[in-house]
Design a protein with these regions (language model features):
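Asp-box/BNR beta-propeller blade signature and adjacent active/binding-site loops
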Residues: 1-199
């Protein structure tokens, strides 16, 4: 169900530097809101954080309104998440206590069309983000692209487009393995496309 700690919703679990597990989670009933489930016993039990809500908009609220489907990484400064929103941009929130509490989300400046994202941190600290960089709520889910950050997510640059054809290419998942990015995403909601990119 949607209540209580459950583990991840869409995006992958992150093992933190203290050995605990952090699972990104969200609810899409009414106001969209996200939270994290944290486990200190290898997933036997989970503790849910407080909801992470967007600040109130200056104008009329879009429907739906809020943030869902966080994607996580950890570095020396703390634990961080990018959030899917209905605001035309990905939002970012940060934690200084290993995911127990989170800052109020703020725009990352990365255009997003209210479509799923995923990211991974390489061993050298570089972040790779797969997303639809289209700044319109419910906008076209093409292209699907790969962005890169070398400064902990403060700035992002376009690395490559995975697909630019018209259509729907969304819900990416990204892993790092043996010097390669392993990426999947939907293809027209009919099948799954897979990429292996050696870096």
């Amino acid at each position: 169900g949607d209540e209580g700690g459950r583990g991840p919703v869409r995006n992958k679990i992150l093992r933190l530097s203290d050995g605990s597990l952090l699972a990104p989670a969200s609810i899409e009933q009414g106001e969209w809101r996200c939270f994290m489930d944290r486990s200190e016993d290898e997933g036997e039990t989970w503790t849910r954080t407080a909801d992470i809500r967007l600040p109130e908009p200056a104008g009329e609220r879009p429907n739906p309104y809020g943030a869902i489907q966080p994607s996580l990484w950890e570095d020396e400064a703390g634990v961080h998440a990018l959030l899917r929103t209905s605001q035309g941009y990905l939002y970012r929130t940060d934690s200084e206590d290993l995911g127990r509490s989170w800052s109020q989300p703020a725009s990352s400046g990365i255009p997003n069309n209210n479509s799923g994202i995923d990211l991974v941190k390489a061993p050298d600290g570089t972040l790779y983000l797969a997303c639809n960089p289209v700044g319109e709520n419910w906008g076209a889910r093409s292209p699907i692209s790969l962005l890169i950050s070398k400064d902990g997510g403060a700035h992002w640059e376009h690395l490559t487009h995975l697909v630019t054809m018209p259509g729907e290419y969304s819900y990416p998942a990204v892993l790092w393995q043996d010097g390669c990015l392993l990426i999947t995403h939907t293809w027209q909601r009919k099948s799954i496309q897979f990429w292996k990119i050696r870096l």
